[in-house]
């Protein structure tokens, strides 16, 4: 009898097809997130669970899933999962690093360019008919923004995504500053990046991109005090997690001109609506789509499947998050 896996959203078919060869697969096909009560019902008889960032996988879920042996998160981040509790119960947790790195780094630069060059504002100007109504073909002071070439970029968080952002910055001949919990000496040599304390990165950079995981240390690390350190011409881009930035302080910074603009792909709560923030024309907003490319999402689905198939075969999953769980339970659905 095949082990049963429940997938909380319709991921790309390539991953589902791989899983169907080895598992009994059930997929939540609706566009909306699975309701909490329905999730608790569905996990009662599953051996494996594929989850999205929008699902909170905590003690309550584990208590309702006596057969659950592995949770495969369809994301690189896993702050939606109580990993400590999973480990205590001998439940393996995996994620999808690397495969979405380029897509997310691309999106960071898309937000940076869109904000620096008023792309969205210009688009609205044309679509609304305002350009036609003005009857002016071109004006030397319209939509003045900032060039990226030769400027200083500050990258907060210098893991895979942070370093991929730095590689793109090299193409713009930018000076690269970074802040990370640990020095990355090899990356410094490869990319010509310079380590600085966080406060110095904020002070010196023309553009700041946030690429840190959400932890106790990074929660609201960009607050009013630190926003005031930035240049009034600076642009902040957040492709990390919404709670890395104090939204109220950011709104104040954008309104009062402490910084020139912001590009945000992540928010404190998702889905998100904030009339005060959304009314500002110096911020570009996208709905958490950093990894939204055909290539990345299919690669994520394949990696999810590879993790589950490896576990089923008694092998350590390729991207195991909680490696200490191996001491508690060997991989495989028959292991106790």
Curated annotation (Swiss-Prot):
MF-aspect GO terms: glyoxylate reductase (NADH) activity; glyoxylate reductase (NADPH) activity; hydroxypyruvate reductase [NAD(P)H] activity; NAD binding
Residues annotated for NADP(+) binding in this entry: 158-161, 180-182, 239-241, 288-290
Enzyme superclass (EC): oxidoreductase
Active site: 241, 270, 288
Primary location recorded for the protein, binned into one broad class: cytoplasm
InterPro entries with a match to the protein in the record: D-isomer_2-hydroxyacid_DH, D-isomer_2_OHA_DH_cat_dom, D-isomer_DH_CS, D-isomer_DH_CS1, D-isomer_DH_NAD-bd, Glyoxylate_reductase_GyaR, NAD(P)-bd_dom_sf
Compartments reported by the entry: Cytoplasm
Entry EC no(s): 1.1.1.26
Protein name: Glyoxylate reductase
Species whose genome carries this gene: Pyrococcus furiosus (strain ATCC 43587 / DSM 3638 / JCM 8422 / Vc1)
Lineage: Archaea, Methanobacteriati, Methanobacteriota, Thermococci, Thermococcales
């Amino acid at each position: 009898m095949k082990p049963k896996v429940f997938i909380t959203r319709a991921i790309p078919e390539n991953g589902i097809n791989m899983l169907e060869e080895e598992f009994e697969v059930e997929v939540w096909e609706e566009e909306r997130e699975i309701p909490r009560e329905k999730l608790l019902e569905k996990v009662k008889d599953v051996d494996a669970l594929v989850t999205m960032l929008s699902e909170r996988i905590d003690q309550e879920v584990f208590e309702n899933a006596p057969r659950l042996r592995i949770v495969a998160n369809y994301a690189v981040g896993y702050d939606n999962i109580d990993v400590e509790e999973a480990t205590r119960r001998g439940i393996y947790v995996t994620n999808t690093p690397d495969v979405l790195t380029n897509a997310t780094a691309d999106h960071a630069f898309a937000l940076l360019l869109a904000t620096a060059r008023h792309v969205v504002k210009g688009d609205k100007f044309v679509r609304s008919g305002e350009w036609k109504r003005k009857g002016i073909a071109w004006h030397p002071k319209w939509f003045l923004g900032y060039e990226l070439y030769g400027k200083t970029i500050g990258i907060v968080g210098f893991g895979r995504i942070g370093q991929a952002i730095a590689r793109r910055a090299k193409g713009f001949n930018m000076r690269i500053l970074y802040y990370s919990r640990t020095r990355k000496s090899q990356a410094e040599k490869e990319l010509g990046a310079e380590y600085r304390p966080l406060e110095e990165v904020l002070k010196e950079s023309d553009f700041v991109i946030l690429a840190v995981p959400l932890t106790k240390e990074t929660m609201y690390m960009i607050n009013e005090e630190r926003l005031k350190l930035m240049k009034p011409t600076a642009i902040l881009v957040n492709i990390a997690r919404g709670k890395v930035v104090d939204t109220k302080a950011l709104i104040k910074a954008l309104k009062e001109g402490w910084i020139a603009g912001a590009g945000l792909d992540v928010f404190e709560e998702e889905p998100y609506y904030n009339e005060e923030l959304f009314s500002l024309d110096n911020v570009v907003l996208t709905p958490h789509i950093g990894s939204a490319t055909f290539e990345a999402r299919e690669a994520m689905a394949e990696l999810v499947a590879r993790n589950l198939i490896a576990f089923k075969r008694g092998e350590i999953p390729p991207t195991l998050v909680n490696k200490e769980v191996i001491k508690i339970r060997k991989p495989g659905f028959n292991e106790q």
